Design a protein with these regions (language model features):
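Nucleotide-activated chemistry modules centered on ATP-dependent adenylation/adenylyltransferase
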Residues: 1-194
Length: 194
C-alpha cells in the first residue's frame, strides 16, 4: 500500500506516519499545505518553518503546496495537490492524523473518494489520554507550538508536553480538548523513537 501522509510536524501527523509504517504501508512522501494566512480551517500552520526538518528526520520527501484560506478553497487546494502527485507517486491512499475532528476526516475522505484513493486516519477515536500518555512514555519530545485556548497558560508555548502538563490539561475547568484537536493548542515533535 503506497500512501501519502498529510504532515504538519505535530504529534498526530507524525504518529500517523509511524502507525502507517507499523501496518507495513509504504509512506512515500509527506504533504504539507501552506495556507496564505494563519487562520486555516483545516491545516496546522505554526510549524511550517520546521516541517521540512521533521520530514527529513522521518526519512520522507516533503511536498509543499500553496493553499488559499477558506472552508471550500482549502479542500479544493488539497484535492489539487493530491491529484498532481497521485500518478507520479503511484498512490493507493492518503494518511491523516485526524483524532476526533469530523470536519477534517470527512473532507479528507471526500478528496480521497473523488480521486479514487483510500483514506486512513489510524488514530481515529483513539482513547485520548492513553494515546498521549503512550507517546510521553515512549520518549516523544512534543512541544507546544501555539496556545489558542483560554485556560491553557500562554507560557507553555515552546515548552514540552509532560505528564504533569497533560494532567493539568485534564483538570482544566475550561475543558480544552485534551489532545488539542479543536486547535486549543498545536504541537511540534522534536524527537521520537522513530
Amino acid at each position: 500500500m503506497r500512501v501519502l501522509a498529510l504532515l504538519s510536524g505535530g504529534k498526530d501527523s507524525v504518529c500517523a506516519v509511524e502507525t502507517a509504517r507499523g501496518f507495513g504501508w509504504d509512506v512515500v512522501a509527506g504533504l504539507t499545505l501552506v495556507p496564505a494566512e494563519d487562520d486555516a480551517w483545516m491545516f496546522h500552520t505554526p510549524n511550517l518553518a520546521a516541517v521540512r526538518g521533521v520530514a527529513l528526520c522521518l526519512g520522507l520527501p516533503l511536498l509543499e503546496a500553496p493553499c488559499r484560506n477558506g472552508e471550500l478553497e482549502e479542500v479544493e487546494d488539497l484535492e489539487a495537490a493530491v491529484a498532481a502527485v497521485k500518478q507520479p507517486l503511484a498512490l493507493d491512499g492518503l494518511v491523516s492524523g485526524a483524532l476526533a475532528s469530523e470536519y477534517q476526516r470527512i473532507r479528507i475522505e471526500r478528496v480521497g473518494h473523488r480521486l479514487g484513493l483510500k483514506t486512513f486516519a489510524p488514530l481515529w477515536h483513539k482513547e485520548l489520554r492513553g494515546y498521549l500518555r503512550s507517546l510521553l512514555a515512549g520518549g516523544w519530545d512534543i512541544r507546544f507550538s501555539r496556545i489558542a485556548a483560554g485556560g491553557i497558560p500562554p507560557e507553555w508555548a515552546g515548552e514540552r508536553l509532560t505528564p504533569e502538563r497533560l494532567g493539568a490539561l485534564e483538570r482544566m475547568a475550561s475543558r480544552p480538548h485534551v489532545a488539542g484537536e479543536g486547535g486549543e493548542y498545536e504541537t511540534l515533535v522534536l524527537d521520537a523513537p522513530c
